[in-house]
Amino acid sequence: MIKLVLLRHGESQWNLDNRFTGWHDIDLTDKGRREASNAGKLLCEAGFEFDVAYVSVLKRAIRTLWNVLDEMNLMWIPVIRNWRLNERHYGALQGLNKAETAQKYGDEQVLVWRRSYDTPPPPLERTDERWPGSDRRYAALDADEVPLTECLKDTVARFLPFWHETIAPEISKGRNVLIVAHGNSLRALVKYLDGISEEDIVGLNIPTGIPLVYELDDNLKPLKSYYLGDQEELKKAVDAVAGQGKA
């Protein structure tokens, strides 16, 4: 049986501050580092081994992966970093407090910006210092590839080619794969794997630092999926994510 593990990074400082993070390169909190280490312990206890790991180019995901691999004594395996696994870009909302934004625009509008499939937040200008076009890690990209804002549909459009061209072929070869990414880039992949509708994806929340395991058939179609760890803690973590955008 093929198993794929997805992991959202541990709590970041801007998760703690309840701010829209997007492509801003913020680090983990102490709690986030503990979450990452605990994820590694859970994976060890469940008997997982990995041959290759994929991660975004943002430090909160990279550091999470480091902690996981350290706990698993797998620091030596190949790691592929790619911008297509980045969090969705939150445009002009990036850096703003979610609750304060909800007070200004209303809970319903913020929920649409956070969780709808095809409604992006207001865009940045390219002159805005929050636009990542001058960041060296994106130097190989055309300016039009560096987003001014993104909805989940945009995130799906950039993530899935990397899945089909790079990750899925490795899984099909029998390699054990770990993907460490972000709430919305993982929502994009889960939407594809589970065939979730554009309407129902609004209700999907992925908690920080808890491994999500997919059991796949030979065609990489899901047979089942489940989170590792205590289910009460899982529910609390999911509910906390769901409540972040409320006034």
From Swiss-Prot:
Family annotation (Gene3D superfamilies): Phosphoglycerate mutase-like
InterPro entries: His_Pase_superF_clade-1, His_PPase_superfam, PG/BPGM_mutase_AS, Phosphogly_mut1
Substrates-to-products reaction catalysed: (2R)-2-phosphoglycerate = (2R)-3-phosphoglycerate
Signal peptide from the UniProt entry: none
Enzyme class per UniProt: isomerase
Matches recorded under Pfam families: His_Phos_1 (PF00300)
Keyword Lipid biosynthesis carried by entry: no
Keyword Isomerase: yes
Molecular function per GO: phosphoglycerate mutase activity
Record-marked site positions (Transition state stabilizer): H182
Active site (UniProt): H9 (tele-phosphohistidine intermediate), E87 (proton donor/acceptor)
Pathway(s) annotated for this protein in UniProt: Carbohydrate degradation; glycolysis; pyruvate from D-glyceraldehyde 3-phosphate: step 3/5
SUPFAM superfamilies documented for this protein: Phosphoglycerate mutase-like
Keywords: Gluconeogenesis, Glycolysis, Isomerase
EC code: 5.4.2.11
SMART domains with a match to the protein in the record: PGAM
Binding site for substrate: 8-15, 21-22, 60, 87-90, 98, 114-115, 183-184
Sequence similarity: Belongs to the phosphoglycerate mutase family. BPG-dependent PGAM subfamily.
Protein's name according to its UniProt entry: 2,3-bisphosphoglycerate-dependent phosphoglycerate mutase
